[in-house]
A protein has these predicted regions:
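Short C-terminal beta-strands that terminate individual repeats in beta-propeller domains
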Residues: 1-5, 43-49, 88-98, 134-146, ...
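Conserved strand-to-loop turn within each blade of WD40 beta-propeller repeats
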Residues: 25-29, 70-72, 118-121, 170-173
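Tandem repeat protein-protein interaction scaffolds
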Residues: 1-37, 52
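Repetitive beta-architecture junctions, highlighting loop-to-beta-strand starts
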Residues: 31-33, 65, 73, 122, ...
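Short loop/turn segments immediately following beta-strands, especially the blade-tip
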Residues: 79-86, 130-134, 180-190
Length: 227
C-alpha cells in the first residue's frame, strides 16, 4: 500500500517504462508529484507539481529520470537531478511566450526530446526545452484549429518507437485525426509561431445519443482501438 503521496486524492498515476517506478500527482490542496519505488512501498522523490489542477503525469519513454506533468494553464518538464544534497526533482515550467495560456491534457514526447501537446483551443504546440518552437494549425484561414475544443489525446503511432510515422489526436469534437510525424517534428516557425500542417485522415466517433463523443483516451489493442 502506498501512503502519504497526497493529502486528499490522486488525479493521475503512471508506471515507468520498465515498471519499476510509479509516478502520481495529487489534487488540491497539495498538488504533489511523487515518484515511488512501488514494490518497496517507498517514496523516492516528491515535489509540489503546480498551484492548480494537474491532469496528467508521464515518464519519458526515451530518457531515464525525466517526467512531464500538465494541467490547468501549464505544462512542466521534470528531471531527477543529482545535487549536493542528493537526488531532487527539478521542474521547468513551459513558457507560452506570445501565445495565450492553455490547459494541457494530451501530450507526447518525440524521440529527439521535443514535446508535442494539445491545447484547449484545438491547436498543437511543439516544445523544445521549455519554449514553444511552433504552434501547429490547420489549412485554411489563419489560426485554423486542428480540432474544435480541447485536444485530450496525443499519440505517436506506426513505424518504431524511435521512428514513428504518424501522430494521432482526439478530443472534445469527437474526431480522431492522423497527421504526418515528419512534418510535425520538422516544423519551423518564422515571424509568427503558426505552422500549417496537413490532415492525413480522420474518423468521427459518435455517442449513443447521436452527438459527437468527447474522447478522453485511446488505448490500442491487438487488432482494435478502445475509445
Amino acid at each position: 500500500m502506498l501512503r502519504k503521496g497526497t493529502e486528499r486524492a490522486y488525479s493521475h498515476v503512471t508506471f515507468s517504462g520498465d515498471g519499476t517506478q510509479l509516478a502520481s500527482v495529487g489534487s488540491a490542496p497539495d498538488y504533489m508529484l511523487t515518484v515511488w519505488d512501488w514494490k518497496s512501498e517507498k517514496v523516492i522523490l516528491r515535489a509540489k507539481a503546480f498551484s492548480q489542477d494537474i491532469f496528467r503525469v508521464a515518464f519519458s519513454p526515451y530518457v531515464e529520470g525525466q517526467l512531464i506533468t500538465s494541467g490547468t494553464g501549464h505544462i512542466r518538464f521534470w528531471k531527477m537531478a543529482s545535487t549536493f544534497t542528493g537526488l531532487k526533482l527539478q521542474g521547468d515550467i513551459g513558457k507560452f511566450g506570445q501565445l495565450e495560456l492553455s490547459d494541457v491534457s494530451g501530450f507526447a514526447e518525440l524521440p529527439d526530446g521535443k514535446v508535442l501537446c494539445g491545447t484547449e483551443y484545438g491547436t498543437l504546440l511543439l516544445w523544445e526545452g521549455n519554449l514553444v518552437k511552433a504552434q501547429l494549425v490547420g489549412e485554411g484561414e489563419e489560426d485554423t484549429p486542428l480540432h474544435q475544443g480541447m485536444i485530450e489525446v496525443v499519440l505517436l503511432e506506426g513505424g518504431t518507437a524511435q521512428a514513428p510515422e504518424v501522430v494521432l489526436t482526439a478530443g472534445a469534437d469527437g474526431f480522431i485525426r492522423t497527421w504526418d510525424f515528419f512534418e510535425i517534428d520538422n516544423a519551423e516557425s518564422d515571424e509568427t509561431p503558426n505552422v500549417v500542417i496537413s490532415l492525413k485522415k480522420e474518423q468521427r466517433v459518435v455517442a449513443s445519443n447521436g452527438e459527437p463523443a468527447y474522447i478522453v483516451d485511446l488505448v490500442k489493442g491487438n487488432d482494435h482501438w478502445l475509445v
